[in-house]
Swiss-Prot record:
Keywords on record: Acyltransferase, Amino-acid biosynthesis, Cytoplasm, Methionine biosynthesis, Transferase
UniProt name for this protein: Homoserine O-succinyltransferase
Main subcellular location of this protein, as a coarse class: cytoplasm
Described purpose of this protein according to its UniProt entry: Transfers a succinyl group from succinyl-CoA to L-homoserine, forming succinyl-L-homoserine.
Length: 375
């Protein structure tokens, strides 16, 4: 058996689309570009393609590294590659940066052809359904009529679910990890607090901060700090940080004293250094809006009747952001429609971020599922 290996050095590719893309909001993008990466080789039948959809802070860079930046490892590198659960000896894997993103795909920092200036806050709202429509156009460009599977964790899982509804004939399997059919009110509340942190930053300038040569780093930092709290479980925080004081005793100040404070500030500063605030706003709104049951009277099983793919749904025991109950809601609705669905709840103390980690049980489960997919 081959030892798991990296896909090695990878090169992003760019696809330009001159045809306008109609959006769910009623608006349209006149033209746009998608940045993507591929791993493995497309077979002669063009039947082994797998699309990996990213979550809020992810990108097209799913696996491997860049020759000029070897430390920049793909966000799901532990899952994708030769001998890994999503084995690139068998599958042709594609990662795409979503519309509105900040990693090379057309987004708020891109130039608005109508004004010659960055889009900023004028960039149209995009939804999960819009992302999937753009991904389908990329598949057309690559000559892929049908994906063997569409895979995603968290928000990526929502995209995989939407694929089964928007293009049921173009997807064989959907793998939804740590995901949900819609956000709870609590999740929408977290997103709103994060957005307000950005919107209230004096450097936000109504979303047109590019023209002022500044970024709303303070607001974006606070938004990320809040997000990180929800990505971790109470047990994970206790095990990793506890109540440890950096100086061994209280110094009675508002500066960093507890290790958890140091961690959150570090994560916030790091995120604010590379992510775009307008992209954060757009992406959290896309999360909030996603609800395939809305047009079916709130009845999920009615919404999922259109799906024909086989499903693997995975949740994690301590994930309270996208709890196992939300995954089971998807499973029950699929079973109601007599669809083929496998479900697993993985014991993990890492919370929502478990879907990114190299957990043996989790990876064995995914490997077994992908192994039985016929291409």
């Amino acid at each position: 058996m081959i030892q798991p290996q990296s896909v090695g050095a990878v090169v992003p590719q760019r696809a330009h689309f001159a045809e306008p893309l109609p959006l769910r909001s009623g608006d349209a993008l006149p033209e746009y570009e998608l940045l993507y990466e591929t791993y493995g080789e497309l077979n002669a039948a063009r039947s082994n393609a797998v699309l990996v959809c990213h979550a809020l802070s992810g990108s097209h860079h799913v696996a491997g590294h860049y020759a000029d930046d070897p430390g920049n490892i793909g966000w799901w590198d532990n899952l994708v590659g030769p001998g890994k659960p999503l084995d690139t000896r068998k599958f042709f894997v594609i990662g795409v940066n979503n519309l509105g993103g900040c990693h090379g795909t057309t987004g708020p920092a891109s130039i608005n052809p109508a004004s010659g200036k960055p889009w900023g806050a004028d960039f149209p709202f995009v939804t999960v359904e819009d992302w999937v429509a753009a991904q389908a156009r990329l598949a057309d460009r690559l000559g892929i009529e049908r994906f063997a599977a569409v895979v995603g964790g968290s928000l990526g899982g929502m995209q995989a679910l939407s694929w089964t509804l928007q293009y049921p004939e173009r997807i064989g399997h959907a793998v939804l990890v740590a995901s949900a059919p819609r956000l709870t009110a609590q999740n929408i509340a977290f997103n709103e607090v994060a957005r307000q942190a950005i919107l209230s930053d004096p450097d936000f300038h109504g979303g047109h901060y590019y023209e002022h040569g500044v970024v709303p780093a303070r607001g974006l930092k606070l938004a990320r700090m809040l997000g990180h709290i929800t990505y971790l479980s109470d047990d994970a925080m206790a095990d990793k940080f506890g109540r440890t004081l950096r100086h061994g005793k209280a110094v009675y100040s508002y500066d960093v004293e507890f290790e958890i404070e140091s961690y959150l500030r570090y994560q916030g500063d790091k995120f604010a250094g590379f992510f775009d605030a307008n992209t954060y706003l757009l992406t959290t709104k896309a999360l909030d809006y996603f609800d395939p049951a809305f047009e079916h009277g709130g009845i999920l099983r009615a919404a999922l009747a259109r799906a024909s793919a086989d499903f693997l749904v995975v949740s994690f025991s301590t994930d309270w952001r996208f709890s196992p109950a939300r995954s089971r809601e998807i499973v029950y609705s699929l079973l109601h429609n007599r669809r083929n669905v496998s479900y697993a709840e993985i014991e993990s103390d890492a919370g929502h971020d478990s879907f990114l980690l190299d957990d043996a049980h989790y990876h064995e489960l995914l490997a077994a599922y992908f192994d039985r997919i016929e291409v």
